[in-house]
């Protein structure tokens, strides 16, 4: 017997936020479902009440229609900041197919990324992913499970030549090449502490105490990037 595919994880949803937004607009559950019907989702008022009490949770399509009916950004109904690709996509009111088309990857590739948290796109596709879903650079590295890869590149930048790490880091952090080159040069320069025979480095010459990635993001944030850090 063929196994059924696992049910999708429910969209993050705050019943209290839904109640608050509806009350703030002075809408009845009947009026909310009328508004949702205008966006192609037809339900009964009991569904709205069930969501608000936490009895059950809306599907992606229902969640987006509810946000539109309540005239609020979907993220405000989540109750927490988006934590994965699916959350960011839903916050942008996009289906998986719409996201894949705008990013420039196949639907299958995008579905795999959401399911596994592993992203295999090149620098251009990674830029499109962050731009389309509204993900900052630091979070983009995190939700695509590329933090270890970035850490490895930064260690190699410290131990070797920063120039050799421009291309691999560009796959992970989609910023203009001149900006990335300058940032990596600054980053490596902070670790090239001059040493003098018979003396310890002065306080001004001490290496940065922050983890490599934290210092990299600090340096990068001082530059202008299309996608915010």
Predicted regions, residues:
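Short alpha-helical DNA-recognition segment
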Residues: 26-49, 93-112
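Charged, low-complexity intrinsically disordered regulatory/assembly segments
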Residues: 157-229
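A short, Lys/Arg-rich alpha-helix, primarily the initiator
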Residues: 1-25, 72-92
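Short, charged recognition helix plus adjacent turn
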Residues: 78-101, 142-174, 223-227
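DNA major-groove recognition helix of helix-turn-helix/homeodomain DNA-binding modules
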Residues: 59-76, 123-141
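Helix-turn-helix DNA-binding elements, focusing on the entry/boundary residues of the two helices
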Residues: 18, 29, 45, 63, ...
